[in-house]
Structures are given as C-alpha cells and as structure tokens.
Amino acid sequence: IPSRPVGGPCYLGKLTMLAPNHTDILKILANSSRTGIRRKRSVSHLDDTCSDEVQLWGPTARIFASILAPGVAAAQALKEIERLACWSVKQANLTTSLLGDLLDDVTSIRHAVLQNRAAIDFLLLAHGHGCEDVAGMCCFNLSDHSESIQKKFQLMKEHVNKIGVDSDPIGSWLRGLFGGIGEWAVHLLKGLLLGLVVILLLVVCLPCLLQIVCGNIRKMINNSISYHTEYKKLQKAYGQPESRIV
C-alpha cells in the first residue's frame, strides 16, 4: 500500500480484485460482449391473452405523479410499455395474417387468369386465328413476387418474436455472469442470493427493531414509575392509608 494514496475512499478499488472501479467494470463488460456467445435467457413470447388496452396519462396526472409519487409514475409507465408491446405484437400478427390471406387470393386470381388465357388461345387457334389478329394478345406479362412476399412474412414473424417478457431476470443475469452453467447451479445461486438478502435485511432492520422494542419497554417502565410516584404523592397529600385507596 503506498504511503500517500490518492483518490480518497475510492482508492480501495485499486488495491483489491474484489472491488474494481467503474472503468474496470466497463472493460470487463466490453470484453464479455465481444465474445459473441449467445446465452439462453428465460424470455417468453407475448400471447393473445395479454392486455392491449393502452390508457396514457394526461400532462396533469404525469406532473403530479412525478412530483408526489415517482414510484407510482414509474410503475404506470412500465405497465403502459408492456401494453404497447402487446398491442404491437397483436397488430403485427393481424397484419401478417391479412397479408397472407391477400396473397392466397392473388395466387388464386393468377391461376384463374392463366386458365382464361389458355382458353382464349385455344379458341383463337381453333378458329384459325393467331394472337396477331387481336391487339395486345401476343404480349402477356404476369409478374410473380410470391417468393419475396414469403421472405418478408418470415422477417415480420422474426421481428414479432423479438418482443418478449423476461420471466426470470435474476436467472438470466446469473447465466450471463457465469456463462453456460446448469439449471441446478442457477437455482442454487438464487437460493444463496435470497438467503444473503434476508441476512442483510435482518442485519439492517434488527437493530432498529430492537431499538424500538427497548424504547417501548423503557417508556412503559418510566410510565409505571411515574404512576407509582404520583400514587405515593396522593397518599401523602390526603393522608390515607395505602390499603384503602383503590
């Protein structure tokens, strides 16, 4: 340890591996993101039962909620974001279904047009006429973009699947932190974290609870002593024996 450390209390982060500073944490996160390893996350896709009724607050409600109850405002914002995501997923699914039905209709119309053209050509040949006898019959162009449309449908479905709900954020964080660990290890670490949180809460809250209980007991004892003192004073003032005073 240098005799003249520079940096105040934060200098401890430069002396031990267990307390890295902010720059070291950013470097570790940057190196882990460059590995390119995709880890499994506990993300579930939104289904048709989710609520898509978006009801945004007005300016007055937002201002009062932000000043008086910031936690309520944040919870309301998260709820509306979830409903907007549900609305977007349902809207994309409806759009994909509608475009798929239109593609089926266009395909059937295409087949009908080709059949009619074949019938017209057959009738013209049967009567000894060629396509040159009718203006515009020799050139027939019917474009087909079904393959491109199918690819775009697939892209739309992939984009919809990107919207999901992380049902186990702690487990996802542990998997991202420790790499490809098994589910049993994830459950074990979650149990250890839960126990650590409970112990920390007890360490933080137990002195306060003990102080409150001791204060109440001390107050009760003081009240009892004061009542007994007042009782003695009343006995001396009225000169009545203790046995006759109830």
Swiss-Prot record:
Record topological domains on the Extracellular side: 1-192
Marked site (Cleavage) residue numbers: R41, S42
Keyword Lipid biosynthesis among UniProt keywords: no
Transmembrane segments: 193-213
One term under GO cellular component: membrane
Coiled coil: 75-125, 143-173
Protein name: Envelope glycoprotein gp95
Source organism of this protein record: Avian sarcoma virus (strain rASV1441)
Lineage: Viruses, Riboviria, Pararnavirae, Artverviricota, Revtraviricetes
